[in-house]
Structures are given as structure tokens and as C-alpha cells.
């Protein structure tokens, strides 16, 4: 059993990974924050991506009320985690109705409508991984003639940096603005890892760890990663030594934490 001191080191390392992966380019999604950073109070498009915990729906709704974009899109078909997401949403929102085969975009749309009385402009319901989340979004915007020179990308914090790297490769003329759907810190409480606060639908700590750990090899630009030197899915990502060190220590302590991607939904 890990000592309190060892768990505190684990918490620090988890938070290092989380801070690196869960990027937010502005402190809040408001016109003022965008204007201070980019010189414009609105982006052309904001996209919420399936794969996020349910709290992403609240982030989108808050952004819509604030008016941070001209067009709002929810992106996400049905992938290998969608049934788990459906079950989680039914548990959290038993009065929310959606079809048994609903895509993640449709589920988020139902949630935003039911809880906030709001509706996104477009749904993209065919993509099944981060890679075609971006390419299908790009193609949908082009098909509808929607200008997109600036794009707010809002994804689960564990996958936010990957989403931005995908957009940099597939939409090179577009300014990506990252805003992860949540920001949490892991602490030690009663001899266990715990969250400082838990957003709606938050992963349990073991699942959160596997999601964080699985991202670093993907982002590593070598023959095994998703970057230009590997599978070619992403733009190059620099991984700081501090992040690499935290990942190495966590892997040594929790070798089970490395998840394997389902090849049907890789990307």
C-alpha cells in the first residue's frame, strides 16, 4: 500500500499530465477573454466534441449564452465508448430522453436542449475518433459554406491537446483556440486519490489515469506515435521533460494504466 508521501507524488504527477493535456488558451470562454488574447470578441465557430464527460454540455451552453462564436457545432458519432456514455447520461439525467442508438452529438444536443433550452446550429454525427472528428467537422463547415478562420475546440481535458494538434494538421489555415471541458486537480484524501471537485460525469480516478497515460505515447513524435514521424495523424507536439518524467514515474507505479486503442476507432 502506498504511503501518504508516495500518493502525494502520484497526485503531483497526475496533475502535471493533466495541466499539459487539458489546455485552455483563455481563462474563461467570454468575449472579453477572447478579445484580450486574440483581438476579437468572437470566434467563427465553436465545436464541442464527443468523448468529453457530460460537463462539456454545460461548457457549450455557457459559451452560447456568452456569445463567443458565430456558429456552434456538436461533433461525435458512435464509437467504442458511446454505449458507456449513454449509460452514464441515463444514470446522471434519468429524465433525459434520447434514442437507444443515439450518437454522442445527439446525446449532448438533447442534454443542452433539456437542461439549458439551447440548440447548437449543427450536429456532426458520423465521426468515430478524434481524427475524423476534425476532418468531418471541416467538411461539414465547407459544405454549409460557413466561414471558419478561428475555431474554439472543446474536448475532454485528457484529449484536448491531441485535438488541437489534429486541427493544426487538418485545418492549417484556421486559428485553433483550446478550451478543455473541465479543469480538475487530484489531491490525496483519506489515503486515496480524489478530486478537488468533480464535474458532471467525471471519470473515476483509475479511468482518468488511464486516459491521461494513454495520451503521451500518442503525442510523442516517434515511429510509434501519431505525429509526423509516426502515423502522421497530428502536427508535431513538443513534450516537456517534466511531463515525460511524470509519465515515467506513473508508469512504473501503475503499469496497468496504459490502455490500448481499439483499432476500429484509432486516430
Predicted regions and their residues:
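A structural signal for short, hydrophobic/glycine-enriched beta-strand patches
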Residues: 1-202, 208, 257-267
Amino acid at each position: 500500500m502506498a504511503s501518504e508521501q508516495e500518493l502525494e507524488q502520484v497526485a503531483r504527477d497526475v496533475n502535471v499530465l493533466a495541466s499539459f493535456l487539458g489546455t485552455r488558451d483563455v481563462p474563461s470562454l467570454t468575449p472579453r477573454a477572447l478579445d484580450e488574447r486574440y483581438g476579437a470578441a468572437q470566434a467563427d465557430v465553436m465545436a464541442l466534441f464527443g468523448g468529453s464527460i457530460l460537463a462539456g454540455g454545460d461548457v457549450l451552453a455557457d459559451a452560447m449564452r456568452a456569445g463567443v462564436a458565430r456558429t456552434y457545432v456538436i461533433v461525435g458519432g458512435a464509437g467504442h465508448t458511446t454505449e458507456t456514455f449513454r449509460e452514464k447520461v441515463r444514470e446522471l439525467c434519468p429524465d433525459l430522453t434520447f434514442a437507444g442508438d443515439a450518437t454522442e452529438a445527439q446525446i449532448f444536443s438533447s442534454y443542452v436542449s433539456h437542461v439549458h433550452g439551447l440548440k447548437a446550429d449543427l450536429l456532426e454525427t458520423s465521426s468515430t475518433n478524434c481524427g475524423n472528428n476534425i476532418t468531418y467537422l471541416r467538411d461539414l463547415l465547407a459544405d454549409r459554406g460557413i466561414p471558419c478562420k478561428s475555431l474554439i475546440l472543446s474536448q475532454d481535458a485528457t484529449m484536448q491537446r491531441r485535438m488541437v494538434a489534429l486541427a493544426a494538421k487538418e485545418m492549417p489555415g484556421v486559428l485553433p483556440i483550446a478550451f478543455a471541458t473541465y479543469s480538475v486537480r487530484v489531491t490525496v484524501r483519506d489515503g486515496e486519490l480524489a478530486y478537488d471537485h468533480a464535474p458532471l460525469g467525471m471519470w473515476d480516478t483509475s479511468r482518468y489515469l488511464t486516459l491521461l497515460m494513454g495520451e503521451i505515447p500518442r503525442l510523442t513524435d516517434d515511429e510509434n506515435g501519431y505525429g509526423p514521424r509516426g502515423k502522421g495523424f497530428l502536427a508535431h507536439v513538443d513534450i516537456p521533460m517534466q511531463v515525460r518524467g511524470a509519465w515515467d514515474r506513473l508508469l512504473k507505479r501503475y503499469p496497468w494504466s496504459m490502455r490500448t486503442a481499439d483499432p476500429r476507432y484509432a486516430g
